[in-house]
């Protein structure tokens, strides 16, 4: 049996860059081994599979290495694919461990993440990952603690003193992959924060990918991390808007926006441009 997979670029910046994702709309899911093989064949950080389910869609995500619980840029790509097939609107998505939604209008899609939260890092874990990233304590920003952020997946956040510090991070891929899989951490996120603007990278050894140009899942999780650390500026409605820049060091510039309330452990709305489908579907 063959499967049709389309390619979309999520979080493009003024029509350029973006993060590619495969999208497979199917009547029934392929078996797990086939979905993993398709993800490997596509070669993107994630490929998303969706089938009709109750009032919405049952959704699963695969990296080239394994299934992942949630992927932001693939969710936006899915939103664009669903809008192409069914028309612009809101779509309910049942993930493995959460229920979310995605909407699409014209070239912009918005997802609602699983509840976003964070917790502190122990010193031994922090030192382990600093060593993996060839960083010292002196590289860390004094204004925020390193931490673990969650919004469907776990992300390790390393706030650094400058954008150039973020750009210069290199890491031991094999050591990172082993440790991240042991600790159930999906990405390492070095970042620099100026007000409500975040410049960051997504190191994805756990998914067999050196770096992901952009991930909405990490953006949502970091929104929760900043909220928990009282690092956001809220409007009169007690909402905060964040702007993320990612992928620059890879030559794949990506822009994301996030909207979240001041209430802890609540979802984050992540938006961005989506381009595609790019070329004809791949039949696998």
Predicted regions and their residues:
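Anion-binding (especially nucleotide phosphate/pyrophosphate-binding) glycine-rich loop
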Residues: 37-68, 193-198
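Short glycine/threonine-rich catalytic loop with a Thr-x-Gly-x-Asp
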Residues: 68-71, 209-223
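Catalytic strand-loop segment that frames the active site of acyl-thioester-processing enzymes
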Residues: 185, 196-205
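Short beta-strand-to-turn element immediately C-terminal to the catalytic PLP-Schiff-base lysine
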Residues: 23-27, 50-51, 157-160, 191, ...
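Active-site-proximal helix-loop elements at catalytic-domain edges
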Residues: 24-49, 163-193
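Acidic, low-complexity central loop/insert segments
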Residues: 56, 62-180, 227-284
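Short N-terminal binding/cap micro-motifs at the start of the first secondary-structure element
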Residues: 13-17, 22, 31
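N-terminal, positively charged, Ser/Thr/Ala/Gly-biased leader segments
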Residues: 1-17, 135-138
């Amino acid at each position: 049996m063959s499967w049709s997979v389309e390619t979309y670029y999520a979080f493009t910046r003024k029509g350029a860059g973006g993060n590619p994702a495969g999208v497979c709309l199917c009547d029934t899911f392929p078996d797990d081994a086939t979905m993993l093989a398709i993800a490997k064949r596509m070669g993107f950080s994630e490929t998303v599979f969706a089938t009709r389910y109750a009032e919405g869609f049952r959704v699963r995500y695969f990296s080239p290495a394994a299934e992942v619980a949630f992927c932001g840029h693939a969710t936006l790509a899915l939103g664009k694919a669903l809008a192409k097939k069914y028309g612009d609107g809101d779509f309910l998505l049942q993930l493995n461990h959460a229920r979310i939604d995605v909407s699409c209008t014209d070239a912009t899609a918005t997802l609602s993440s699983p509840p976003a939260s964070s917790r502190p890092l122990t010193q031994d874990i922090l030192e382990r990952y600093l060593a993996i990233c060839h960083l010292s304590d002196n590289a860390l920003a004094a204004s925020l603690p390193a931490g673990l952020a969650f919004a469907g997946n776990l992300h390790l956040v390393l706030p650094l003193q400058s954008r150039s510090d973020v750009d210069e991070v290199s890491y031991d891929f094999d050591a990172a992959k082993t440790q991240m899989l042991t600790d159930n951490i999906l990405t390492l996120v070095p970042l620099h924060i100026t007000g409500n603007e975040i410049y960051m990278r997504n190191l994805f050894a756990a998914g067999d990918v050196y770096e992901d140009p952009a991930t909405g899942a990490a953006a949502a999780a970091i929104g929760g991390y900043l909220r928990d650390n009282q690092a956001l500026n809220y409007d009169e409605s007690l909402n905060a808007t964040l702007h993320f820049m990612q992928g620059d060091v890879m030559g794949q510039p990506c822009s994301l926006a996030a909207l979240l309330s001041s209430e802890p452990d609540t979802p984050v709305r992540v938006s961005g441009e989506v381009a595609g489908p790019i070329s004809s579907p791949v039949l696998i």
